[in-house]
């Protein structure tokens, strides 16, 4: 649908027919009918008001990962969250509190934390996207989840049109989920995330790939060591976004590792005719286990490098 009215002059710049491909990690996708890049909370309010006055659909865009845009684009207003105030990292006894704007590059924040010798997010290095997207999915990798360090999430509540702060418990964090992608999907727009890190915590080395990486090392790895190790491991799997490398372009891991009853493990082992202990799995509480989706996909006949037509 085309909107013949001209875009009126605003403090916020609203563009028309903006290609979305450059804003996604896949580098594909059609145009946004209207596009606004917001750098302050005031601009965010203004952009929402712009959409409401014209009865436009709203899509909030962060770092552009975990996202596939149709060639037809988006017939509404795309709000690109580019709020990037300086990150605050404040020591408080055995803890460190940090306040981070939603538009901050996630990996850059992880690096900043690790460079100060602080553990808590070192295993989340190399995950594409911005800080504002991390609480939505409760991103996790290599034995860590971002929810373990989040204390507060500041948001714009689209129902009340007011900025509110949601506590850790109010966010309803679970495995790859929160209220932001389930019960309250499309209600809140994240503008800031507060973290708390334990200064006495040791780097997380529970993941098998990390244990193999540091096997035989005499000294205990630092958070920065783990940061670089995780990025190297991700790069080796084609899971690190690297400009100029065609094999390192993706939307991130967009599937969830299934959590199932322990009895399912025996069934899979019988089907594959292998011992159950040969199947990688982790305890998930209350008689349940977590299975790696990538491993299951490969055993189902979709090995690395599988292609179907132009997709693969």
Q: How should these model regions be labeled?
A:
Residues 2-159:
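Anion-binding (especially nucleotide phosphate/pyrophosphate-binding) glycine-rich loop
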Residues 15-16, 21-25, 163-312:
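Phosphate/pyrophosphate- and phosphate-bearing ligand-binding catalytic cores of soluble enzymes
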């Amino acid at each position: 649908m085309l909107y013949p009215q001209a875009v009126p002059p605003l403090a916020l710049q609203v563009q028309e027919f903006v290609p979305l491909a450059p804003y996604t990690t896949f580098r594909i996708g059609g145009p946004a009918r209207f596009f606004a890049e917001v750098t302050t909370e005031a601009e965010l309010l203004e952009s929402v008001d712009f959409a409401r006055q014209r009865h436009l659909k709203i899509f909030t865009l962060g770092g552009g990962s975990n996202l596939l845009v149709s060639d037809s684009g988006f017939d509404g207003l795309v709000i690109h969250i580019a709020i990037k105030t300086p990150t605050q990292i404040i020591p408080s006894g055995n803890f460190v509190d940090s306040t981070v704007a939603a538009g901050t590059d996630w990996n850059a924040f992880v690096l900043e934390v690790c460079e100060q010798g602080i553990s808590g997010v070192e295993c989340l290095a190399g995950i594409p996207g911005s800080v504002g997207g991390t609480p939505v999915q409760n991103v996790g990798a290599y034995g860590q989840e971002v929810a373990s360090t989040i204390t507060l999430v500041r948001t714009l509540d689209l129902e009340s049109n007011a900025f509110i702060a949601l506590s850790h418990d109010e966010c309803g964090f679970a495995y790859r989920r929160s209220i932001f992608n389930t019960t309250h999907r499309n209600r809140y727009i994240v503008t800031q995330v507060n973290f708390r890190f334990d200064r006495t915590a040791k780097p997380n080395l529970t993941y098998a790939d990390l244990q193999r990486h540091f096997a035989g090392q005499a000294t205990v790895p630092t958070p920065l060591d783990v940061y670089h190790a995780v990025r190297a491991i991700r790069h080796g799997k084609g899971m690190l976004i690297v400009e100029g490398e065609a094999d390192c372009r993706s939307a991130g891991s967009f599937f969830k590792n299934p959590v199932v009853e322990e009895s399912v493990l025996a069934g899979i082992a019988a089907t594959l005719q292998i011992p159950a202990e040969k199947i990688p799995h982790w305890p998930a509480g209350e008689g349940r286990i977590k299975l790696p989706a990538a491993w299951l996909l490969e055993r189902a006949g979709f090995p690395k490098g599988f292609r179907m037509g132009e997709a693969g």
